[in-house]
Amino acid sequence: MKTSLKSAPSQIKKSIDIIIFDETNSQLIMNIIPDTYSYSIYKTRPVEFTITLPIILRLIFNLKDIKIFEQFTTNKGFFKNILWQFLCIYIKSYIQIVKPKAVITSIDNCTKFAWLSKHMQDIPFIAIQNGFRLSYALDNSLYHCQHLFCFGDFEVENFPKREW
C-alpha cells in the first residue's frame, strides 16, 4: 500500500461543500458540481495522510469505533483488518475536521466508503454506480450506502431488500 504523509495544517481546507472520495472518475463528478459549491478530492491511491493536531485528537476520540473481533473486510487476516479499520477511522476523522455537506464517489463498491457511510450518518454519502452488478448472491453484509445513483430498476428493487 502506497502512502503519502503531509503535516502542514494549511493543507486542510475546512468547510468544503463536497468531498469527492477517490480520484477515479473525479473529473466526471467535478463536471456536474455547480460552480457555487466548493469541492476537494480525497485521494486514496496512494492513501494520503494529513497530520494535524485536530485530526490527531479526533482520531483518538474515534478509536472507539474499532471492533477487534468483527470482520469488516473479506479475505484479510486479523491484523490487516485492524489496520484497515484504523485507516477508516483516520478518514472519518479527516472528514469530520473538513465538515463537508456531502461525500460523493463513483466507486460504489468501495469497502472504505461503505464503512464511512455506515459510521457517519450526519453527512450524506452518495455513490454513483460504476458497473453492472450481475449477482447479489455474494455476502455483502459489509456493504452500506446511504444514497446510490444506479443504472436501473433491478438495483432500485433489490437495494432495500438487502438492507444496505
Predicted regions and their residues:
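Active-site and donor-binding regions of nucleotide-sugar-utilizing enzymes
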Residues: 2-37, 42-164
